[in-house]
Swiss-Prot record:
Binding site for O2: H65
Organism: Bos taurus (Bovine)
GO MF annotation list: heme binding; metal ion binding; nitrite reductase activity; oxygen binding; oxygen carrier activity; peroxidase activity
Main location as per UniProt: cytoplasm
Biological process, per Gene Ontology: oxygen transport; removal of superoxide radicals
Gene this chain is encoded by: MB
Family classification: Belongs to the globin family.
Function, as annotated: Monomeric heme protein which primary function is to store oxygen and facilitate its diffusion within muscle tissues. Reversibly binds oxygen through a pentacoordinated heme iron and enables its timely and efficient release as needed during periods of heightened demand. Depending on the oxidative conditions of tissues and cells, and in addition to its ability to bind oxygen, it also has a nitrite reductase activity whereby it regulates the production of bioactive nitric oxide.
Superkingdom of origin: Eukaryota
Modified residues (Phosphothreonine): T68
Locations listed in the record: Cytoplasm, Sarcoplasm
Name of the protein described by the UniProt record: Myoglobin
InterPro entries: Globin (IPR000971), Globin-like_sf (IPR009050), Myoglobin (IPR002335)
Amino acid sequence: MGLSDGEWQLVLNAWGKVEADVAGHGQEVLIRLFTGHPETLEKFDKFKHLKTEAEMKASEDLKKHGNTVLTALGGILKKKGHHEAEVKHLAESHANKHKIPVKYLEFISDAIIHVLHAKHPSDFGADAQAAMSKALELFRNDMAAQYKVLGFHG
């Protein structure tokens, strides 16, 4: 399920918009994740106390973590599917330490697409959304495969 060169270009063009404000985009993605799927908040001891969107928006720690998440994802996307080493490292921490189920990766993928479309509607049309969805699915599938190797069935 690889992406064509054209699809990767759409993904990377969209990601260029993220890189103009990684922390801001990351914060919005995490807020979307936590408000849309409150159960995901339970995996984050540092953020469990944040109960409202206003509290989340005011949290510098949440913004920093959003920056960390999207910086890592950006590095993976720029590998255009050749991300084995990055995914292996990420899967190890997410399976063994954080215990993040694959389903939650799907939730955050949806949040990323939603935030990109909301913030950049003219630059993130149907073709770009489809390409990003495909790239994020590739990432999730590779994470799931690594989870299996690690014996994590989350």
